[in-house]
């Protein structure tokens, strides 16, 4: 991937949920909820404070995270769908 987020932004590859219910019913795209789990594929350098110092982000590439249903902006890079959002939009890291 050739995308580098700026400042306190991160790029997440959403983890898709099952497209079929346990009973075998196929869920159409229009009825699916936006994924709320993903893997971080790129991070920005960090946030600059009032003194001009850069504080690096806590999240790193490879972290699996939970984020808000409507957080971020969807983009497509080389056919891969990503969501770009601020680090503060992430609820936490999944272990």
Curated annotation (Swiss-Prot):
The keyword Endoplasmic reticulum does not apply. The keyword Cytoplasm applies. GO terms for cellular component: cytoplasm. It is found in: Cytoplasm. Its main location: cytoplasm. SUPFAM superfamilies: GroES-like. Keywords: Chaperone, Cytoplasm. Pfam families: Cpn10. GO terms for biological process: chaperone cofactor-dependent protein refolding. InterPro entries: Chaperonin_GroES (IPR020818), Chaperonin_GroES_sf (IPR037124), Chaprnonin_Cpn10_CS (IPR018369), GroES-like_sf (IPR011032). GO terms for molecular function: ATP binding; metal ion binding; protein folding chaperone; protein-folding chaperone binding; unfolded protein binding. Signal peptide: none annotated. Heptamer of 7 subunits arranged in a ring. Interacts with the chaperonin GroEL. Belongs to the GroES chaperonin family. Together with the chaperonin GroEL, plays an essential role in assisting protein folding. The GroEL-GroES system forms a nano-cage that allows encapsulation of the non-native substrate proteins and provides a physical environment optimized to promote and accelerate protein folding. GroES binds to the apical surface of the GroEL ring, thereby capping the opening of the GroEL channel. HAMAP family: CH10. This is Co-chaperonin GroES. The gene is groES.
